[in-house]
């Protein structure tokens, strides 16, 4: 039974101005445009300026939301920022965004579930609002992955970019957005995708490339193309829905080949899939809100559409949900 009382009422996004194309990368590492497109589907990614950080781009995504939907955020009572690249270890990026927005009397927390972060953030927002503890929550997926990317490592630097997306979630028991969720984590595989912190070992393995993102691409690929279809099946069962009732599938935009394999295994046509990787690369927790906003701007997402979101990545963690699209037509 659906007990959600939370509705997504607005969306916004922001990407930095600087473009890093495949041709640019060809001058930096042993690669080329054809090789990158064939294996990943990515054509370019955005890169934050030296003085531009996660709180800055997250704030700009909220500003976009406010301008397009004429929303006030003065009475927001919780800010959840989903990121693994905060400006500082402390204070949180959420607190910095709260200050930039000038909101008083609001909670502010960062949530680190890497590429599954945004879907975990929506899960938290739905629970906090449906329980009656909160009425209005900003959920922001924002990353500046370029600042933890080794641009001599072609296995990672071709993939990642920077960007931010934000949604406003409000109390509404008459037209809730959220239908069902499915969450999971396999920490025993944590050393397949990591960015080092204080510890120098994980699962008995010496960690490498201190301070930068490290990925065992083939291992993560094999895990994702099996785990995500199973998770999609579970979230459909919890909603008592069939896959042909889904209008749009929005997976984490890690790699187009991976998305194609997930679609093939789950029986969802690629034509019903929204992704943001072609123009923005893998932006971790920002890929799903960026893809949703692309769907809005291109007129694909319609009121009442059933949308299946699935985030997956570092942890290795995953989180999926089904929502009914309830965002009204933007005012501007």
Swiss-Prot record:
GO terms for cellular component: cytoplasm. It is found in: Cytoplasm. Residues 253-257 are annotated as: ACP-binding. Its main location: cytoplasm. CDD domains: KAS_III. The keyword Transferase applies. GO terms for biological process: fatty acid biosynthetic process; secondary metabolite biosynthetic process. It catalyses: malonyl-[ACP] + acetyl-CoA + H(+) = 3-oxobutanoyl-[ACP] + CO2 + CoA. InterPro entries: ACP_syn_III_C (IPR013747), ACP_syn_III_N (IPR013751), FabH (IPR004655), Thiolase-like (IPR016039). Pfam families: ACP_syn_III (PF08545), ACP_syn_III_C (PF08541). Homodimer. This is Beta-ketoacyl-[acyl-carrier-protein] synthase III 2. The gene is fabH2.
